[in-house]
A protein has these predicted regions:
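Short S/T/G/P-rich N-terminal loop/turn motif that feeds into the first structured element of a domain
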Residues: 1-86, 94-101, 120-229
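A generic structural signal for short hydrophobic patches within well-formed alpha-helices
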Residues: 98-99, 108-111, 115
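Short coil/turn segments at secondary-structure boundaries
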Residues: 104-105
Length: 229
């Protein structure tokens, strides 16, 4: 069992056993918090900080091999919760099953040692790509706001420069349940979006390194014949 979170085995089972005709691309979204120093379990930090251990983990070659794509990656510059998040990462997997099958690959398990050493706690959850609704194409974004929220109403219409998607399950977390991910692309003078309609939330403001979200959502919309805006 990993030290950095609780596995939802019910959701893991749904990912592994999703019928092929119902399966398809899924965003696996990672909220990440690192140890100050890596902990390899033998009293050694490997000469790395927690963040550096996670950099060593980065399984880019494995993702390429299974047809997965890094959809987003960035550093948190304003954490508006008490959780202390450091990074946000999103990977689009071609299917839910491919995410589960990756866990048993030897090359992935070898790299995962570094994630185990570097990660203090994380939330990892799935959002079906074809169900993400995206408003009109955003202009230049100085920062991106990620709001992981829980509420009792249905998925709303995204505001301008925003995308929203339903959370279908949380594979790794702290036991809380989430219903929606909201992503807002903001210019330098834009205010943070309101959050007065939610029961729980994890909000972070992020400086982007990689952002392919809207391109991947548009491709999924085209494949399903359902516009995302």
């Amino acid at each position: 069992m990993p030290r950095y979170g609780m596995i939802d085995f019910d959701y893991a089972g749904r990912l592994a056993n999703c019928p092929p005709d119902e399966d398809g691309p899924v965003f696996m979204v990672n909220y990440m918090n690192y140890r100050e120093r890596a902990d390899y379990g033998d009293g050694s930090d490997g000469g790395r900080s927690g963040r550096e251990a996670d950099d060593e983990y980065a399984p880019v070659d494995v993702l390429d091999d299974i047809g997965a794509v890094v959809a987003y990656f960035g550093d948190v510059i304003d954490d508006q919760t008490s959780t202390g998040w450091h990074r946000i990462g999103i990977v689009q997997y071609p299917t839910r099953r491919s995410f589960i099958e990756m866990q048993s690959r030897r090359d992935f398990r070898d790299k995962h040692t570094h994630k185990e050493a570097g990660m203090d706690h994380t939330i990892v959850f799935g959002v079906p790509v074809h169900l993400v609704r995206s408003a009109s194409e955003a202009g230049h974004a100085d920062r991106v706001v990620f709001d992981l929220v829980r509420h009792e109403r249905g998925l709303g219409t995204p505001a301008p420069q925003q995308a929203t998607g339903p959370v279908e399950g949380t594979i790794m977390g702290d036991g809380r349940t989430w219903t929606e991910l909201r992503i807002s692309w903001l210019g330098a003078g834009d205010d943070l979006p309101p959050l007065d309609d939610v029961d729980d939330r994890e909000r972070v403001v992020v400086r982007t390194s990689i952002d392919r979200i809207r391109t991947l959502v548009a491709a999924a919309d085209g494949a399903h014949g359902t516009p995302g805006s």
